[in-house]
From Swiss-Prot:
Residues 408-418, 426-439 have a biased composition (Polar residues). Residues 118-127, 246-262 have a biased composition (Basic and acidic residues). It comes from Rattus norvegicus. This is Cell division cycle 5-like protein. Homodimer. Interacts with DAPK3. Component of the precatalytic, catalytic and postcatalytic spliceosome complexes. Part of a spliceosomal 'core' complex consisting of CDC5L, PLRG1, SPF27, CCAP1, CCAP3 and CCAP6. Interacts with PLRG1, Lodestar/TTF2, and NIPP1/PPP1R8. Identified in the spliceosome C complex. Component of the minor spliceosome, which splices U12-type introns. Within this complex, interacts with SCNM1.
Amino acid sequence: MPRIMIKGGVWRNTEDEILKAAVMKYGKNQWSRIASLLHRKSAKQCKARWYEWLDPSIKKTEWSREEEEKLLHLAKLMPTQWRTIAPIIGRTAAQCLEHYEFLLDKTAQRDNEEETTDDPRKLKPGEIDPNPETKPARPDPIDMDEDELEMLSEARARLANTQGKKAKRKAREKQLEEARRLAALQKRRELRAAGIEIQKKRKKKRGVDYNAEIPFEKKPALGFYDTSEENYQALDADFRKLRQQDLDGELRSEKEGRDRKKDKQHLKRKKESDLPSAILQTSGVSEFTKKRSKLVLPAPQISDAELQEVVKVGQASEVARQTAEESGITNSASSTLLSEYNVTNNSIALRTPRTPASQDRILQEAQNLMALTNVDTPLKGGLNTPLHESDFSGVTPQRQVVQTPNTVLSTPFRTPSNGAEGLTPRSGTTPKPVTNATPGRTPLRDKLNINPEDGMADYSDPSYVKQMERESREHLRLGLLGLPAPKNDFEIVLPENAEKELEEREMDDTYIEDAADVDARKQAIRDAERVKEMKRMHKAVQKDLPRPSEVNETILRPLNVEPPLTDLQKSEELIKKEMITMLHYDLLHHPYEPSGNKKGKNVGFATNNSEHITYLEHSPYEKFSKEDLKKAQDVLVQEMEVVKQGMSHGELSSEAYNQVWEECYSQVLYLPAQSRYTRANLASKKDRIESLEKRLEINRGHMTTEAKRAAKMEKKMKILLGGYQSRAMGLLKQLNDLWDQIEQAHLELRTFEELKKHEDSAIPRRLECLKEDVQRQQEREKELQQRYADLLMEKETLQAKF
C-alpha cells in the first residue's frame, strides 16, 4: 500500500520562518500556494497558524484581572461566541477559549480541594495537542532530516525567485498597455494638429472624480486677514532625539521582553503577598480566621469630679470672655487670659482609612458559570441553581470617583472628611504629622501655651493669624533691643588681587566648567606656547624645510694657519661655527622627517644623538629672546640697504630670480645610493642615471597622489553637482526640443504665408473663371428653355391638327 501522509503536528521554528517569509511575498489570501512550501502542513493549518500565533498584532502577555473579569461576563452574555468576544477583549478566539477553560478547571480543582500549583490544561505524557497552532514553535534540531533540508532549500529558492512567469507576463502586459496609451496619445495629437478635435470619452464614475474635482474643498471667505502668524519660525533641532534608536522606535521584541519581565515580577509579588490564600490551600480551612486578643485600656488619668471642675472653670471663663467682649475690652492682656478653648479645631489629624471589603469576582463568576453548566434539566422542577450575586461592573475597569466634600456636614463629631478615601481635602485642614499622638480633638487657640503648637494652628482664622504676626514682630523687636553695643571698630583691607580671586571663586562656586572645556583651554594654552616657542626657531624649522641628516664639520678653517685669518674671515668662521651648533641642536631636538615616509622608516635621515649631545656640551646652544632676534633682524636689514646702495643693486624681478634659481638647482644632483647631494659636474654617468630614475619615481608618486586626490575630488563634486548636471542636461534637452519646435513652426509659418500669397493672386482668376462658367451655363440654360418652349408649342400644334 502507498504511504499515506497526514499533515499536521507540532510546528517547528523552520516552518514558522518559511510561513512568515511566504506571507510577506504572497500575502494573506493565497494559503494554498503558501502551504505548497510546507510539506507537512495544509493551507487551513497555515492560515490558522498565522492568525492564531504569528500575526504581530496578537497579544501574548499574561492575562490581567480586568481581562479575566471581562471574559467571564462576556462568556455569560454570549456563550460559545468566541469570535465575537475575542476583538472586545483584544485576544484571539483560541486564547479566550483556552483561558476560559483554564479558569473553569482551576475553580473545579479548588472546589475539589486538589492541588492547584500545576496548570490543569497541561498535557500529560502521551497526549496529542489538539491545537498545535496556538503553541510556541519547537526549536530546530542540530541534525535535520533530509526531508526538512530539502523543504528548506526549495522554499528558499522559490521565495528568492521574484521574476517568475506571472511577473514577466504582468510586466509585458504593462508595457503593451503603455504602448497603446502612447499610440492613442500620438493619434490625438496628430488629429488636433490637423484641425480635428476628438473629445475623449471618459467613463462616468459612480463616486467623486478625484481628477476633476477637489474632494472636501472649502474655499476661503472673501476679505483680508492677518497672516503674521503663518510665518514659519525655525525651531532649534534637538539632535539628541535624532539618534537611530529614537527614529526607529521601540522594537516589538524589546516590548514583549519588558512585558514578560513585568509578568514575572507580578507573579513573584502575588506569591509573596497572597499569604492567606496559601495558608487556606495547605490547611483546607474554608475561611481564614484569627483569634482576637483581649482589649486592654490604660487607667483613666482624670476622675469625674475633676472633670466637673474643669467644666465649671470653662463656663466661668466663657462668661468672663463674653462680658469683656460686650464691654469693648480688646487689649492684649484680656485677649490672652480670656481665650476660647471650647471650640474644636477643624484640623483633625489624618486617620488611617479602613481597607474596603472586597470579594474575588473572578472566583465568583467562574463558580456561577460552572453551576450553570452542570445544572439539570428544568423538567425535574425544584429550586433554581443558587448563584452568587453579581453585576456587570467587571466588564469595564473600576475606578474611584473623586468628590468634593460637603463643608456643611463636616462637624467635629462626624467622621473626618479629610481622611475619607478619594475626597478632596479642604484648605487649612491638611493634617501635620504628629508622632506618638492619638488623633483627636485639639483646642483652637492656646494663648497660655498649655498645649504644643503642632496641633493648635488654625490658619483659617484671620484673628489668629494677626495675633501670631503681632507676637512675632514684638519678639523680633525685643530681640534687636537686647543686642549689646559694639566694643571695637574693625577696618578690613583687601589685597590687590582680592576682587579677581573673589570673581574666580564666585565663578567656581556658581558654575562648574565642563571637562571638555577645561581640556580645550589647556590644549589652546599648549598650542600658544608651542607657537611661541616655534617663533624662536630659525626659518628652516618653522617652515619644515629639508635639512641635512649629517653635519659636515670640515668646513671650518684651522685658526693657527699662516698667514693668519683676517677679521672678515674670522667673522665668517664664527658664523659657520654657530651654524654647525644650530644644525646639531636641530638634529637632536627637531629631526627632519620627510612627509612621504613613516616614522622609524627613514634610514637615510637617522642621526646619532650621542654625537650631537657631545658636541653641544663643548659648544652649547644659546637661546635668544624675541627682542634680541628682532634687533639682529633690524641690523641685517640696515646692512642689506647699505650694501644695496653701495653696490647700486636694484630690485630683482621674479623672472631673473627664477632663472638664477634654475641655474643653481641644475648644478646640484641628488645621489639616492648615498642619500646626499653633490655637484652635477662631479657625478658619474651611473650616478646621473640613478638620480634621474629617482626623480622619475618621485614624479610618478606625485602624479599618482594627485590623480587619487583628483579622483576623490571628482567623486565628491559628482555627488554634490550630479543632480545639477542631470537637471542641466534635462533642461538643455528641453531647450533643444523647444528650439526645434520653434524652427519647425517658423518653417510652417513661412510656408503658409507663401501659400497665402499664391492663393491671394489665384483667387481673382478663379472667380473670373467661375463667373464665366456661370454665365455660359445661364446662356445655355436660357437656350435650352427656349428650345423646350418651341418644342412644346410644336407639340401642341401637332396635337391640335390630329
